[in-house]
């Protein structure tokens, strides 16, 4: 099997970008170890602090954030980073070529129950001159690379550099990421959807009508049965979509009027949308294509509907 290093050498990307992606992959191996040790290393539970979104930080949120930050600082080609766990951007190499956005541990509420978590990342070109938050506010179409690492029964890396999507599996024997799926393609149609049904009463009328029709199954207007899935970690739900199709959504809701959206654009929605589009799927807020959004700030939140192209189109029909 081809290693990640061999695959990057054969791709059309620059040596500098390949080096950066290698550093991110190597960091994920260390994170995988920390996640697997869990209670044995005393890293479960809350850290006693909140992130910029007002969410309680888990100990592993802080640990994995520092691991990535230290690795990127040492790599030398990253001008600055933005993280879910950092209030502001973190300047690094003054002459760096890249900006990196990441969620160090997506689904961290799953940590204490030993369920799926992951790391999501996005690489953008760095502008010349001084770096600021404005430097990061580029549409998702500008991404040079994006991916996630899923810490599950096996540790897997999903990666795109704009030339399709590859899945790599971490070999615990050699310590290498090995290419296990080349050219991921999401099926156009599906019989699965992923949504947090407990928020149904807070959704917009269009989303309520769409899900109601799915639940009616064969007897309803869709004329077939659908299954619902929900992992409570975007990285896990999107991985399922890449592997066997489906629709994942965290839609607009009125549960907290100050926060109508849940997922962050820069380090959750954009990288996942890039992966999904590169695999033949679609990604939208319900009203605009995610990768075309002009960001207003690094911690901006958006609604997300992504997955099998025909099913996303069907969902969007209820919003229009």
Curated annotation (Swiss-Prot):
One of its GO terms (molecular function) is fructose 1,6-bisphosphate 1-phosphatase activity. It comes from the Bacteria. SUPFAM superfamilies: Carbohydrate phosphatase. Its cofactor is Mg(2+). Mg(2+) 2 binds at residues 103, 106, 268. Pathway: Carbohydrate biosynthesis; gluconeogenesis. One of its GO terms (biological process) is fructose 1,6-bisphosphate metabolic process. Coiled coil: none annotated. The keyword Cytoplasm applies. Keywords: Carbohydrate metabolism, Cytoplasm, Hydrolase, Magnesium, Metal-binding. It catalyses: beta-D-fructose 1,6-bisphosphate + H2O = beta-D-fructose 6-phosphate + phosphate. It is found in: Cytoplasm. It is an enzyme of class 3 (hydrolase). Its EC number is 3.1.3.11. Homotetramer. This is Fructose-1,6-bisphosphatase class 1. It comes from Shewanella amazonensis (strain ATCC BAA-1098 / SB2B). The lineage of its organism: Bacteria, Pseudomonadati, Pseudomonadota, Gammaproteobacteria, Alteromonadales.
